[in-house]
Swiss-Prot record:
Pathway assigned to this chain's UniProt record: Purine metabolism; AMP biosynthesis via de novo pathway; AMP from IMP: step 1/2
GO terms for cellular component: mitochondrion
InterPro entries: Adenylosuccin_syn_GTP-bd, Adenylosuccin_syn_Lys_AS, Adenylosuccinate_synth_dom1, Adenylosuccinate_synth_dom2, Adenylosuccinate_synth_dom3, Adenylosuccinate_synthetase, AdSS_2_vert, P-loop_NTPase
Cofactor(s) listed: Mg(2+)
Lineage of the organism: Eukaryota, Metazoa, Chordata, Craniata, Vertebrata
Pfam families: Adenylsucc_synt
Protein name: Adenylosuccinate synthetase isozyme 2 B
The family this protein is said to belong to: Belongs to the adenylosuccinate synthetase family.
E.C. no: 6.3.4.4
HAMAP family in alphabetical order: Adenylosucc_synth, Adenylosucc_synth_vert_acid
Annotated residues for binding of IMP: 41-44, 66-69, 163, 177, 256, 271, 335
Organism field: Xenopus tropicalis (Western clawed frog)
GO MF annotations, alphabetized: adenylosuccinate synthase activity; GTP binding; magnesium ion binding
Subunit text: Homodimer.
Gene3D superfamilies: Adenylosuccinate Synthetase, subunit A, domain 1, Adenylosuccinate Synthetase, subunit A, domain 2, Adenylosuccinate Synthetase, subunit A, domain 3
Length: 457
């Protein structure tokens, strides 16, 4: 059979192309990935919402309900933490991958809260698919998270600033091979119960002050097992068939961001998963050649929640203005976000790891009132330029930032809908970022709504 007509033995008649090595490689659909390029809260939800309108499947690949995405549709503001925000597309399947950690009470509570807000989540249970290999966050993981933070505060005088959602402890259980997965929950419940009791006992011995109502938790988990069972699927096979079947738009919604990545972020002030592009493959069970466009989402300035190094932070009137105008409060914790100038050193580093094919520049309108705008272009230590983004936090805390000053535009851009309509200096700011990073900017955000995303190409 010719390649044009499909090859025997391949799913759905997938096409087999000979490679230079003579081996056969499958050609199928590719996933489009949206990732945060800074410390989170860049506006990924809005980019995902834009792309999700045409998507057949929208996936989450890592993290848990520590993430926070806000999406505004028909003047209704939906808040997502664990559910892929693409679930508001009635024609798409929302897929939670094996790299995600799931707190079941949080999942159902989030869905119910959003159901009360508008029509977006009607029928969500039929549109949600969960990998059977995803790990489960228990209430005692969350309680342990709080105790760990308290211990850090008492012992070191500072904590990590976690969301206390149990993310670190559950990923620790996963790495220690003592965690429980969705496949365990929906299979033999008596076997699940035994393993749950053993894990709870381990946590109780590590944290004697921890109170665990084992029987009460198991009863709740049995109820959740019945509700969630129809949603649980073998995620590897599900996505393999989607990738190698008829044409489909598959979107991956990254949570957290590059500088919060467990390996490449500002460790230890990071999250507990890989939120760079490698986490897409390991968190969904797909090969690298199935990854297509990788869109990085960048705020027109920089923000960070919690403690940790932040070279371009502005502890002054500028920082306060950005915080106030940008309504910079965490969706998950309600904490004030720290604010500062755009940092190109940080973005170049994020690009090295992720290979962004294009960027979305969010919240440009927040800069509308400034007469001049600074951009961090390089770092110095002891008066000498350093060519890289430092791994060591003590070093990163000591860097001096060299800034380029660009003229502001002092014009309201909230109602602008095309690039040509932007003030001249706003256009220059956008083009300057593109030129310095060597990455095209595909979207510019000038407001909260879906309509306020200007598409350039």
């Amino acid at each position: 059979m010719s390649a044009e007509n499909g090859s025997p033995g391949l799913p759905n008649g997938g096409v087999c192309c000979a490679t230079d090595s003579g081996r056969c490689s499958l050609v199928g659909n590719k996933v489009t990935v949206v990732l945060g390029a800074q410390w989170g809260d860049e506006g990924k939800g809005k980019v995902v919402d834009l792309l999700a309108q045409d998507a057949d499947i929208v996936c989450r690949c890592q993290g848990g309900n520590n993430a926070g995405h806000t999406v505004v549709v028909d003047s209704v503001e939906y808040d997502f933490h664990l559910l892929p925000s693409g679930i508001i597309n009635q024609n798409a399947i929302a897929f939670i991958g094996n790299g995600v950690v799931i707190h079941l009470p949080g999942l159902f509570e989030e869905a119910e809260k959003n159901l009360k807000k508008g029509q977006g989540l009607v029928g969500w249970e039929k549109r949600l698919c969960i990998s059977d290999r995803a790990h489960i966050v228990f209430d005692f993981h969350q309680a342990a998270d709080g105790i760990q933070e308290q211990q850090r505060q008492e012992q070191a005088g500072k904590n990590l600033g976690t969301t206390k959602k149990g993310i670190g402890p559950v990923y620790s259980s996963k790495a220690a091979r003592s965690g429980l997965r969705m496949c365990d929950l929906v299979s033999d419940f008596s076997e699940f119960s035994q393993r749950f009791k053993l894990l709870a006992k381990q946590y109780k011995s590590m944290y004697p002050s921890l109170e665990i109502d084992i029987d009460g938790e198991l009863k709740k988990l049995q109820d959740y097992a019945d509700r969630v069972k129809p949603m649980v699927k073998d995620g590897v096979y599900y996505l393999y068939e989607a990738l190698h079947g008829p044409p489909k738009n598959i979107l991956v919604e990254g949570a957290n961001a590059a500088l919060l990545d467990i390996d490449f972020g500002t460790y230890p002030f990071v999250t507990s998963s890989n939120c760079t592009v490698g986490g897409v493959c390991t968190g969904l069970g797909i090969p690298p050649q199935s990854v297509g466009d990788v869109y990085g989402v960048v705020k027109a300035y920089t923000t960070r929640v919690g403690i940790g190094a932040f070279p371009t932070e502005q502890n002054n009137d500028t920082g306060e203005m950005l915080q106030t105008r940008g309504h910079e409060y965490g969706v998950t914790t309600g904490r004030k976000r720290r604010c500062g100038w755009l940092d190109l050193v940080l973005l170049r580093y994020a690009h090295m790891i992720n290979g962004f094919t294009a960027l979305a520049l969010a919240k440009l309108d927040i800069l509308d009132v400034l007469s001049e705008i600074k951009v961090g272009v390089s770092y110095k230590i002891d008066g000498k330029k350093i060519p890289h983004f430092p791994a060591n936090q003590e070093v990163l805390n000591r860097v001096e930032v060299e800034y380029e000053t660009l003229p502001g535009w002092n014009t309201d851009t909230c109602n602008v809908r095309t690039f040509e309509e932007l003030p001249e200096n706003a256009k220059k700011y956008v083009r300057y970022i593109e030129l310095e990073l060597g990455i095209p900017i595909k979207w510019i955000g000038v407001g909260k709504s879906r309509e306020s995303m200007i598409q350039l190409f």
